[in-house]
Structure formats: structure tokens, C-alpha cells
Amino acid sequence: MLAAFSITPLGTGESVGNLVAETVRIVRASGLPNETNAMFTNIEGEWDEVMAVIKECVDAMAQAAPRVSVVVKLDHRPAEPSGRIHRKVESIEQKLLTED
């Protein structure tokens, strides 16, 4: 399963980078394939392990913020092999190369 998620602390002031960095540390420590970009963190794994990582991130953020906003988008294809986090992007890049 692929998950794209964003966790935002509310009520902590304008700068939230340190809190967001802590959640990225949690994701990276999970050992699951992941990527972080300007808006979301993507993570790949089995349903239970992905959701456990997201929960751990939310719980950590809730320790530092009185309110936490969470956005999650899931792509669940149980019959597909792992590695989709990179293959999906590679597929689009290949299509762009062949259309030029």
C-alpha cells in the first residue's frame, strides 16, 4: 500500500519545521520505503505497518501541539508487489521521455 500523508500542528505558532522534522524521523526510522516532499510524506508497506507509522507520527505531534490536522491519501493494491513508490514515478518519467 502507498500512503501520502501530511500532519500539521495547530496552535504552536507560525514555524512548525522542527515538529514536522520529528515526524519525518519517525517515518525514516520505520525502515519502510519513504519520500518526503514539500507537501507530503509518502510511505509504502503493508496496511497495518503503514497505519502504525502514521499513528506514531500523529501521537508524537500531539505531544507538542494542542491540535493536529492530518490528511491521508491511500493507494491500496494488495496484488501488486512492493516498490511501487518508485515504479509509479519511473513510469511517468519514461512516458515523458518517449513523447519528446
What is each PLM-predicted segment?
Residues 1-100:
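Charge-rich, low-complexity N-terminal segments
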